[in-house]
């Protein structure tokens, strides 16, 4: 993320980011090295290196409904997960470890930028102010302890945040925060509300390139007339207008 903030000599740039710090990210290291890519991985700092499981991957969360749990006040969510035997501060015993190990991160450090995604991946808007401050401040400190480098960038869990959370991020020393809103960023973008494109695991290079143009996004969210108008503007066909002949038929000139 820091490299993207530097001048690009007029060329557009893309930052490749991953969320959560899943153990499977370690298998991508040879790909990063081969293509000279330095991605940013936003890690849950109290899950990675601790032999723990991301809470939504546990059997209890799956049974209770992850989407519903995300919307609960944090204390209620943790209480319900505890009823299924999950305690976020404890080491995973009955479920596979889902976070990167310290050995993984040490091997990846020369080629990967690790930044913050909170400690345990709560919904920020469902936290009390003191809880939110603790998550953001402690995660920043933990990431710096793990990597030995400054932690200045953040990604909102589930893309959910409020003005209060932005204030806390600024006060805690973060310089940017990435949302899940779709779109591009430029020099006018709010650094604490950065947009992104969600790329699925099975996306081809061609589909990735297509998404970067914004055409698939426009096709999904814009009315057909707006898409047509955009293409006309792109092609420079601004001189097209409709006139009516004597016979009452329309023709383009």
PLM regions and their residue ranges:
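Metal-dependent polysaccharide deacetylase catalytic core of the NodB/CE4 family, i.e.
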Residues: 11-14, 33-162, 193-194
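C-terminal active-site subregion of NodB/CE4 polysaccharide deacetylases
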Residues: 1-17, 22-25, 34, 39, ...
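Short amphipathic alpha-helical segments and helix-helix/interface helices
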Residues: 28-30, 102-106, 166-170
């Amino acid at each position: 993320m820091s490299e993207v903030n530097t001048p690009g000599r007029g060329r557009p740039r893309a930052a490749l980011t991953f969320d959560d710090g899943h153990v499977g990210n370690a298998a991508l290291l040879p790909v990063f090295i081969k293509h000279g890519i330095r991605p940013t991985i936003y890690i849950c700092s109290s899950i990675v290196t601790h032999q723990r499981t991301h809470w939504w991957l546990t059997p209890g969360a799956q049974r209770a409904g992850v989407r519903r749990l995300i919307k609960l006040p944090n204390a209620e969510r943790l209480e319900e997960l505890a009823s299924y035997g999950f305690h976020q501060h404890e080491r995973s015993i009955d479920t596979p470890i889902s976070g990167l190990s310290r050995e993984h991160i040490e091997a990846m450090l020369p080629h990967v930028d690790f930044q913050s995604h909170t400690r345990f991946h709560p919904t920020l808007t469902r936290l009390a102010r003191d809880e939110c401050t603790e998550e953001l401040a402690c995660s920043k400190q933990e990431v710096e302890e793990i990597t030995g480098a400054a932690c200045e960038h953040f990604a909102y869990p589930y893309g959910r945040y409020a003005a209060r959370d932005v204030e806390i991020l600024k006060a805690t020393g973060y310089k940017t925060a990435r949302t899940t809103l779709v779109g591009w960023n430029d020099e006018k973008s709010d650094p604490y509300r950065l947009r992104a494109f969600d790329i699925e695991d099975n996306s081809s290079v061609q589909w990735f390139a297509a998404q970067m143009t914004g055409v698939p996004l426009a096709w999904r969210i814009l009315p057909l007339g707006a898409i047509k108008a955009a293409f006309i503007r792109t092609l420079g066909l601004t001189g097209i207008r409709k006139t009516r002949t004597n016979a009452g038929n329309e023709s383009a000139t």
